[in-house]
Amino acid sequence: MQLAMDKAARYGVGCVGVKNSHHYGTVAYYTQMAVKRNMIGFSTTNATPLMPPPGGAAKMVGNNPISFAIPGGDYPPVVLDMACSAVAHGKIQLAARKGQDIPLGWATDNEGNPTTDAQKAMTGFLCPVGAHKGFGLAVIMDLLTGPLLGGHCGGEITGLTGCYERPQGCGHFFMALDISKFTPLEKFREAMNSYIQYIKSCPTTNENVTIYMPGEIEYDLREKRLREGIPLPESIINDLAQLCRESGIDPHGLV
Protein backbone atom coordinates (compact mmCIF):
# COMPACT_ATOMS: atom_id res chain seq x y z
CA MET A 1 0.00 0.00 0.00
CA GLN A 2 2.89 2.35 0.68
CA LEU A 3 3.99 2.11 -2.96
CA ALA A 4 0.40 2.59 -4.16
CA MET A 5 0.13 5.75 -2.04
CA ASP A 6 3.42 7.09 -3.39
CA LYS A 7 2.15 6.57 -6.94
CA ALA A 8 -1.17 8.21 -6.08
CA ALA A 9 0.60 11.25 -4.64
CA ARG A 10 2.23 11.73 -8.03
CA TYR A 11 -0.46 10.60 -10.47
CA GLY A 12 -3.71 10.73 -8.47
CA VAL A 13 -4.20 6.97 -8.62
CA GLY A 14 -1.78 4.24 -7.62
CA CYS A 15 -2.29 0.49 -8.05
CA VAL A 16 0.07 -2.25 -6.89
CA GLY A 17 -0.19 -6.04 -6.97
CA VAL A 18 1.55 -8.76 -4.98
CA LYS A 19 1.66 -12.39 -6.07
CA ASN A 20 2.83 -15.70 -4.61
CA SER A 21 2.14 -14.45 -1.09
CA HIS A 22 0.42 -15.70 2.07
CA HIS A 23 -2.43 -14.60 4.33
CA TYR A 24 -1.93 -10.85 4.84
CA GLY A 25 -4.08 -10.32 7.90
CA THR A 26 -6.85 -7.74 8.24
CA VAL A 27 -7.60 -6.06 4.92
CA ALA A 28 -8.66 -2.77 6.54
CA TYR A 29 -5.22 -2.42 8.12
CA TYR A 30 -3.87 -1.55 4.67
CA THR A 31 -6.75 0.60 3.45
CA GLN A 32 -6.66 2.74 6.61
CA MET A 33 -3.01 3.51 5.88
CA ALA A 34 -4.29 5.60 2.97
CA VAL A 35 -6.68 7.55 5.21
CA LYS A 36 -3.72 8.82 7.22
CA ARG A 37 -2.43 10.47 4.03
CA ASN A 38 -5.80 11.98 3.06
CA MET A 39 -6.34 9.28 0.47
CA ILE A 40 -8.97 6.66 -0.24
CA GLY A 41 -7.70 3.11 0.06
CA PHE A 42 -8.89 -0.12 -1.54
CA SER A 43 -7.49 -3.60 -1.15
CA THR A 44 -8.49 -7.18 -1.80
CA THR A 45 -6.89 -10.59 -1.61
CA ASN A 46 -7.74 -14.07 -2.78
CA ALA A 47 -7.64 -17.03 -0.46
CA THR A 48 -7.94 -20.79 -0.06
CA PRO A 49 -11.21 -22.01 -1.61
CA LEU A 50 -13.99 -22.08 0.99
CA MET A 51 -17.16 -21.53 -1.07
CA PRO A 52 -18.93 -23.39 -3.88
CA PRO A 53 -20.66 -21.61 -6.77
CA PRO A 54 -24.48 -21.51 -6.44
CA GLY A 55 -25.70 -25.07 -6.76
CA GLY A 56 -22.18 -26.46 -6.40
CA ALA A 57 -21.00 -29.08 -3.92
CA ALA A 58 -17.26 -28.34 -3.72
CA LYS A 59 -15.08 -25.47 -2.52
CA MET A 60 -14.02 -23.52 -5.62
CA VAL A 61 -13.30 -19.92 -4.57
CA GLY A 62 -12.07 -18.20 -1.41
CA ASN A 63 -14.17 -15.74 0.55
CA ASN A 64 -11.74 -13.15 -0.89
CA PRO A 65 -12.19 -10.15 1.46
CA ILE A 66 -12.34 -6.56 0.24
CA SER A 67 -11.91 -3.22 2.00
CA PHE A 68 -12.41 0.45 1.25
CA ALA A 69 -11.40 3.21 3.66
CA ILE A 70 -12.43 6.84 3.17
CA PRO A 71 -11.54 9.82 5.39
CA GLY A 72 -14.63 10.80 7.40
CA GLY A 73 -14.09 14.52 7.84
CA ASP A 74 -14.78 15.30 11.51
CA TYR A 75 -16.00 11.73 12.01
CA PRO A 76 -14.12 8.41 12.10
CA PRO A 77 -13.14 7.11 8.66
CA VAL A 78 -15.77 5.23 6.69
CA VAL A 79 -14.37 1.71 6.46
CA LEU A 80 -15.87 -1.26 4.66
CA ASP A 81 -14.07 -4.51 5.47
CA MET A 82 -15.99 -7.59 4.39
CA ALA A 83 -15.54 -11.08 3.12
CA CYS A 84 -17.48 -12.25 0.08
CA SER A 85 -18.93 -14.97 2.30
CA ALA A 86 -21.88 -14.37 4.63
CA VAL A 87 -19.38 -14.27 7.51
CA ALA A 88 -15.62 -14.42 7.97
CA HIS A 89 -14.31 -17.95 8.56
CA GLY A 90 -12.68 -16.79 11.79
CA LYS A 91 -16.10 -16.16 13.36
CA ILE A 92 -17.05 -19.79 12.76
CA GLN A 93 -13.74 -20.93 14.21
CA LEU A 94 -14.36 -18.82 17.32
CA ALA A 95 -17.89 -20.19 17.72
CA ALA A 96 -16.54 -23.74 17.41
CA ARG A 97 -13.93 -23.04 20.10
CA LYS A 98 -16.62 -21.63 22.40
CA GLY A 99 -19.01 -24.50 21.70
CA GLN A 100 -21.61 -22.08 20.35
CA ASP A 101 -24.07 -22.46 17.48
CA ILE A 102 -23.89 -20.19 14.44
CA PRO A 103 -26.79 -18.43 12.70
CA LEU A 104 -28.47 -20.26 9.86
CA GLY A 105 -27.15 -19.00 6.53
CA TRP A 106 -23.52 -18.70 7.58
CA ALA A 107 -22.38 -22.11 6.39
CA THR A 108 -23.31 -25.66 5.40
CA ASP A 109 -22.06 -29.09 6.42
CA ASN A 110 -19.76 -31.09 4.13
CA GLU A 111 -22.75 -32.27 2.08
CA GLY A 112 -24.04 -28.76 1.44
CA ASN A 113 -26.86 -28.87 3.96
CA PRO A 114 -27.50 -25.65 5.95
CA THR A 115 -26.29 -25.99 9.54
CA THR A 116 -26.10 -24.08 12.80
CA ASP A 117 -23.46 -26.47 14.18
CA ALA A 118 -20.13 -24.63 14.13
CA GLN A 119 -18.19 -27.91 14.30
CA LYS A 120 -19.94 -29.24 11.19
CA ALA A 121 -19.42 -25.90 9.47
CA MET A 122 -15.67 -26.20 10.04
CA THR A 123 -15.60 -29.13 7.59
CA GLY A 124 -18.32 -27.74 5.34
CA PHE A 125 -18.70 -24.74 3.04
CA LEU A 126 -19.09 -21.03 3.70
CA CYS A 127 -22.20 -19.46 2.16
CA PRO A 128 -21.59 -16.51 -0.21
CA VAL A 129 -23.07 -13.22 1.01
CA GLY A 130 -26.16 -12.53 -1.07
CA ALA A 131 -25.93 -15.93 -2.77
CA HIS A 132 -24.91 -15.46 -6.44
CA LYS A 133 -23.92 -11.82 -5.81
CA GLY A 134 -21.32 -12.75 -3.20
CA PHE A 135 -20.05 -15.53 -5.43
CA GLY A 136 -19.72 -13.06 -8.31
CA LEU A 137 -17.75 -10.64 -6.14
CA ALA A 138 -15.44 -13.44 -5.00
CA VAL A 139 -14.75 -14.44 -8.61
CA ILE A 140 -13.89 -10.85 -9.61
CA MET A 141 -11.52 -10.50 -6.63
CA ASP A 142 -9.91 -13.83 -7.58
CA LEU A 143 -9.27 -12.50 -11.09
CA LEU A 144 -7.90 -9.15 -9.86
CA THR A 145 -5.43 -10.90 -7.57
CA GLY A 146 -4.64 -13.93 -9.73
CA PRO A 147 -4.56 -13.73 -13.56
CA LEU A 148 -4.06 -9.94 -13.62
CA LEU A 149 -0.87 -10.33 -11.57
CA GLY A 150 0.36 -13.49 -13.25
CA GLY A 151 -0.35 -15.34 -10.02
CA HIS A 152 -2.54 -18.09 -8.60
CA CYS A 153 -6.28 -18.29 -8.02
CA GLY A 154 -8.98 -20.79 -7.11
CA GLY A 155 -7.75 -24.28 -6.33
CA GLU A 156 -4.14 -23.30 -7.06
CA ILE A 157 -3.97 -21.65 -3.63
CA THR A 158 -3.02 -24.04 -0.84
CA GLY A 159 -4.39 -24.16 2.69
CA LEU A 160 -3.23 -21.72 5.33
CA THR A 161 -1.46 -24.51 7.21
CA GLY A 162 -0.17 -27.97 6.41
CA CYS A 163 1.86 -27.27 3.26
CA TYR A 164 5.18 -25.52 3.75
CA GLU A 165 7.05 -26.61 0.62
CA ARG A 166 5.99 -23.46 -1.25
CA PRO A 167 4.19 -20.19 -0.48
CA GLN A 168 0.43 -20.40 -0.08
CA GLY A 169 0.15 -18.55 -3.38
CA CYS A 170 -2.28 -15.74 -2.49
CA GLY A 171 -2.36 -12.52 -4.49
CA HIS A 172 -3.11 -9.05 -3.12
CA PHE A 173 -4.27 -5.88 -4.89
CA PHE A 174 -3.83 -2.37 -3.47
CA MET A 175 -5.20 0.92 -4.79
CA ALA A 176 -4.90 4.46 -3.44
CA LEU A 177 -6.70 7.60 -4.63
CA ASP A 178 -5.26 10.99 -3.72
CA ILE A 179 -8.35 13.05 -2.91
CA SER A 180 -6.58 16.36 -3.51
CA LYS A 181 -6.00 15.38 -7.15
CA PHE A 182 -9.78 15.14 -7.64
CA THR A 183 -11.20 17.89 -5.41
CA PRO A 184 -9.94 20.33 -2.75
CA LEU A 185 -9.47 18.52 0.56
CA GLU A 186 -11.54 21.02 2.54
CA LYS A 187 -14.44 20.68 0.11
CA PHE A 188 -14.23 16.89 0.42
CA ARG A 189 -14.13 17.14 4.21
CA GLU A 190 -17.25 19.30 4.27
CA ALA A 191 -19.02 16.92 1.90
CA MET A 192 -18.17 13.94 4.11
CA ASN A 193 -19.45 15.73 7.22
CA SER A 194 -22.72 16.55 5.45
CA TYR A 195 -23.14 13.04 4.09
CA ILE A 196 -22.49 11.30 7.42
CA GLN A 197 -24.90 13.69 9.17
CA TYR A 198 -27.47 12.92 6.48
CA ILE A 199 -27.17 9.15 7.00
CA LYS A 200 -27.32 9.49 10.77
CA SER A 201 -30.45 11.65 10.54
CA CYS A 202 -32.43 8.65 9.28
CA PRO A 203 -35.52 7.93 11.42
CA THR A 204 -35.18 4.66 13.36
CA THR A 205 -37.63 1.83 13.87
CA ASN A 206 -37.46 2.37 17.64
CA GLU A 207 -35.65 4.53 20.19
CA ASN A 208 -33.10 1.81 21.00
CA VAL A 209 -31.67 1.75 17.47
CA THR A 210 -28.49 3.65 16.59
CA ILE A 211 -27.54 4.43 12.99
CA TYR A 212 -23.92 3.51 12.28
CA MET A 213 -21.68 4.24 9.32
CA PRO A 214 -19.62 1.36 7.89
CA GLY A 215 -16.72 0.67 10.24
CA GLU A 216 -18.07 2.82 13.08
CA ILE A 217 -18.97 -0.11 15.34
CA GLU A 218 -15.47 -1.53 14.90
CA TYR A 219 -13.93 1.89 15.55
CA ASP A 220 -15.85 2.20 18.83
CA LEU A 221 -14.95 -1.37 19.81
CA ARG A 222 -11.27 -0.72 19.13
CA GLU A 223 -11.34 2.30 21.43
CA LYS A 224 -13.03 0.20 24.13
CA ARG A 225 -10.48 -2.62 23.78
CA LEU A 226 -7.63 -0.11 24.07
CA ARG A 227 -9.14 1.11 27.33
CA GLU A 228 -10.26 -2.19 28.85
CA GLY A 229 -8.24 -4.94 27.17
CA ILE A 230 -9.29 -7.86 24.96
CA PRO A 231 -11.55 -10.57 26.46
CA LEU A 232 -10.55 -14.12 25.47
CA PRO A 233 -12.37 -17.44 26.01
CA GLU A 234 -10.65 -19.84 28.40
CA SER A 235 -9.83 -22.30 25.59
CA ILE A 236 -7.79 -19.67 23.72
CA ILE A 237 -6.05 -18.55 26.93
CA ASN A 238 -5.05 -22.17 27.58
CA ASP A 239 -3.79 -22.55 23.99
CA LEU A 240 -1.71 -19.38 24.31
CA ALA A 241 -0.30 -20.53 27.65
CA GLN A 242 0.66 -23.88 26.13
CA LEU A 243 2.40 -22.13 23.22
CA CYS A 244 4.31 -20.01 25.75
CA ARG A 245 5.50 -23.12 27.59
CA GLU A 246 6.54 -24.84 24.35
CA SER A 247 8.48 -21.72 23.36
CA GLY A 248 10.17 -21.27 26.73
CA ILE A 249 8.15 -18.15 27.56
CA ASP A 250 6.70 -17.53 31.01
CA PRO A 251 2.88 -17.60 30.63
CA HIS A 252 2.45 -15.55 33.82
CA GLY A 253 -0.46 -13.19 33.37
CA LEU A 254 -2.31 -15.50 30.98
CA VAL A 255 -3.26 -18.10 33.57
Residue spans of the language-model regions?
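A glycine-rich, acidic short-motif signal
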Residues: 1-78
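Predominant activation on well-ordered alpha-helical scaffold segments within soluble catalytic domains
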Residues: 2-5, 32-35, 69, 105, ...
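Short glycine-rich or small-residue beta-strand-to-loop segments that form or flank ligand, phosphate
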Residues: 14-19, 128, 174-180
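Glycine-rich phosphate/pyrophosphate-binding loops
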Residues: 38-50, 144-160
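Phosphate/diphosphate-binding glycine-rich loops and adjacent basic-rich segments that engage nucleotide
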Residues: 51-119
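Glycine-rich beta-alpha junction loops
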Residues: 84-87, 133, 179-181
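Small-residue-enriched flexible segments
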Residues: 89-150, 162-167
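Catalytic-core signal marking the mid-to-C-terminal active-site face
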Residues: 148, 153-255
